[in-house]
Amino acid sequence: MKKLNINDYNDILNEVLNDIRPTELEKDKLKVFSDKIIAKIKDISKYPVLDIIQVGSTARDANLKDDHDLDIFLRFEKETDRDTLKESGLRIGKEVIDYFNGKSWVEYAEHPYVSGEIEKFNLDIVPCYGIENCEKIISAVDRTPLHNEFLIMSYKNKNLSDDIRLLKKFLKGLGIYGSDLKTAGFSGYLCELLILKYGGFLSLLSDVKNWRPNKSIVLNEIYEMYDLKKEHEFLNFDDSLVVYDPVDLNRNVAAALNEENLCKFIFYSKMFLENPSKEFFYGFDKKITDFLNIRERGYLLTLEISRPENIVEDVIYPQMEKIQKSINKLIKEHDFEYIRYQNFADENTCYLSWEFLIHELPDVKIRTGPPVYSEPGVVNFITHNEHYFVKGCNVCAYKTRKYKNIQILFEDIVNGKLRKIITYPKYVCPENAEIRLGTFVERT
């Protein structure tokens, strides 16, 4: 295998950058548009709005080409009551978008905010409270302007924009970009902190290849900001990756990242460094899935459950995972074996899918009882089991299975006969669901 030099990587990375770097014209149009929006907000916003800030990747020249998302935060004084914050934020957001003949709607997080479309631009106008670093938040989004200020300050005299874009595109290619609960991957803010820490895309990957779960990262800037000594003991987190938030040391920026996605990042960082290719940046996860599916399939089964209206993905996906894990426990208790499981939700339906290695079993099974020398236990066991015998050191018995086919088990689930055994979350109820045989719904 030929030894690689920096040019082997740079040629590929420059090709990718040509695809993902916004043009100067695109940047200029975005700047003109954001200036117009902020100027209009200043015209109509009144006390108690402290200031108006553009945040997010477009504010820091860290966005990908054709990313026209604009995030505007309205910072309110801490004394502002929540109703005033909510009502003012919604009023200002709607009025601004209406002024530019856009389309607006209300999104819901901890409190509602206005989203909209104006021409080709996507716009969020979000109210929050003005707080200081490490000060207790009042609403969940209060840190965001502080993140923006920290990154802009830290980027001075550093040209990191392209490295951030490469990391985002690499993670998108692997299907692990996004901190929503569906993806359980890397947020944009986390990407920027990692590039800031390691100084570049290749430097980051060179370190990542040696990572293990529970890796902990503290940015050098944190020690300077808070005048901390290197031996300072930070709060412990039980997460797959820990990256301390520079504006709130009690928060792990990587908390949403699950262990499997961290391990994908480690594995494919090694793969890229050993054999660099543009392939990693463009739908690589789908190519892997398609390749793995060129094989003999197991027994496929999908539950189709109606999705309630107005329930966001960050609520639906944890609940799908919860019900599926509860069903998985029942599956194993009845000796069926699955190769994999997956969940996915579209606008109207929640899909819980399994691929079974064993979906049909004989009528009989062996029930293992206590050791033969456990007299009280043995007496109780043979009293309740007619066909008993000794196997090894235990008394055992043949029992007739309740379920010899996985489909029958699932029919009892959807008919509500196992309600007392399965944990039902609030919004994902398997009763009256449709059972689809021969179907496995992949996430998209």
Curated annotation (Swiss-Prot):
Cofactor names: Mg(2+)
Enzyme class: transferase
Residues the record lists as binding CTP: S57, R60, H147, K168, Y177
Keywords: ATP-binding, Magnesium, Metal-binding, Nucleotide-binding, Nucleotidyltransferase, RNA repair, RNA-binding, Transferase, tRNA processing
The protein's Enzyme Commission number: 2.7.7.72
Pfam families xrefs: CAA_C (PF21133), NTP_transf_2 (PF01909), tRNA_NucTransf2 (PF09249)
GO biological process: RNA repair; tRNA 3'-terminal CCA addition
Keyword Chaperone tagged: no
Coiled-coil regions listed: none
Residues reported in the UniProt entry to bind Mg(2+): D69, D71, D124
Annotated positions binding ATP: S57, R60, H147, K168, Y177
Reactions catalysed, as given in the entry: a tRNA precursor + 2 CTP + ATP = a tRNA with a 3' CCA end + 3 diphosphate; a tRNA with a 3' CCA end + 2 CTP + ATP = a tRNA with a 3' CCACCA end + 3 diphosphate
Record GO terms (molecular function): ATP binding; CCA tRNA nucleotidyltransferase activity; magnesium ion binding; tRNA binding
Matching InterPro entries: CAA_C (IPR048833), CCA-adding_arc (IPR008229), CCA_tRNA_nucleotrans_2 (IPR042090), NT_2-5OAS_ClassI-CCAase (IPR006116), NT_sf (IPR043519), NuclTrfase_I-like_C (IPR011068), Polymerase_NTP_transf_dom (IPR002934), tRNA_NucTransf2 (IPR015329)
PANTHER family: CCA-ADDING ENZYME
Family: Belongs to the tRNA nucleotidyltransferase/poly(A) polymerase family. Archaeal CCA-adding enzyme subfamily.
UniProt subunit comment: Homodimer.
Purpose: Catalyzes the addition and repair of the essential 3'-terminal CCA sequence in tRNAs without using a nucleic acid template. Adds these three nucleotides in the order of C, C, and A to the tRNA nucleotide-73, using CTP and ATP as substrates and producing inorganic pyrophosphate. tRNA 3'-terminal CCA addition is required both for tRNA processing and repair. Also involved in tRNA surveillance by mediating tandem CCA addition to generate a CCACCA at the 3' terminus of unstable tRNAs. While stable tRNAs receive only 3'-terminal CCA, unstable tRNAs are marked with CCACCA and rapidly degraded.
Note: A single active site specifically recognizes both ATP and CTP and is responsible for their addition.
Protein name: CCA-adding enzyme
Species annotation: Methanococcus maripaludis (strain C5 / ATCC BAA-1333)
Gene this chain is encoded by: cca
